[in-house]
Amino acid sequence: MGFYTDVWDDVFFAVVYVREGGVLERQLELLRQAGWKIIEIPCKKIQNSSGSEEASVIVFEAIEFPYEIPRLPDDWIHEYLEDLHWLDLSQGFFFVLKNYDALFQSPHDPHYYMAKWAAQLLQTVDTELRYRYSKDENGEYDPANILYGMEVSQEHLDQVLEYFEGRAIVIPDFDENDPGAEHPLYVKNNDEVLESWKYESK
């Protein structure tokens, strides 16, 4: 079973970093130096959780939620993830799923339910959070410095790419002079897909 089971999933493109390449760690290092807020979700802990409710608590803790965690955390995690008003995101924000491929290794989750659950967190960051922070004080559109990605081992890279049905973008490098810029491969892929949708709608 692949990721794209819902019509709304079509607008999501997974951004993948190969752990052994060291690209992600170097990029995160430079972004931290530039004042970016980095949130890393430990997918091995997600894998070892009892399910999405306990996993949601892990995410609430990772995003430094300052209030009492809701009684039904799985019902609320996306709503708070698209907000994050208690964090300083003024310089930029990077949301990372660490060791994402761990979610494909559980014998108790043959349909990769938790892999999709975790990837949907990235969807919320990409769409809802990015939109919320993409309006300036005059209400004009001003794209926010918001990035997301998942870290995957070389060993399980093909498995993850197959799960995302060829729509994932593997990041080979980044501009060290502008580490917060979206990678040209990601931008090109988005532009091509959006253009194809316009063509199909004619």
Residue ranges: model-predicted function:
Residues G2-K202:
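Positively charged, polar, low-complexity stretches
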